[in-house]
Amino acid sequence: MAIPEKEIYPRTGDRQTIYLKPVITDPSITVGEYTMYNYNDFVHDPTDFQTNNVLYHYPVNGDRLTIGKFCSITCGAKFLFTSANHTMRSLSTYPFPIFYEEWGLDIRDVTKAWDKKGDIVIGNDVWIGYEAVIMAG
């Protein structure tokens, strides 16, 4: 089923500003009504937000991104999840567990490669500025 354009693009003729909620397909990402994203570099497609802006977000971790209603997210904002944080409690920062098959580890050991920081939760009516980096925890 196609989403009507007016539900994605709030302004006629503007393909750089979108409402995020209708373009998110990942069930671990929740976005409130009227939250908008603007990517004004005229190169990237703002509808690719969950691919280009939500980073190191792997299902094995079970972490979530929640963004409230009426938020304004500007060009280049990134959300970094747990997998971007290599563990500091090991002999090495090398992420051995992500190569679980090669090293004969159980897939459940993958999450031991990084320090668990938790979900990212953004409240209602929050402005996230140009190229901001929001980290888990």
Specify the residue positions occupied by each region the protein language model found:
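Extended, small-residue-rich solenoid/repeat segments and analogous flexible loops
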Residues: 1-29, 96
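A generic short-segment signal for beta-strand/edge and adjacent turn/coil regions
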Residues: 1-7, 33-42
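Flexible, glycine/small-residue-enriched loop-and-beta-strand segment within the central core
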Residues: 29, 36-136
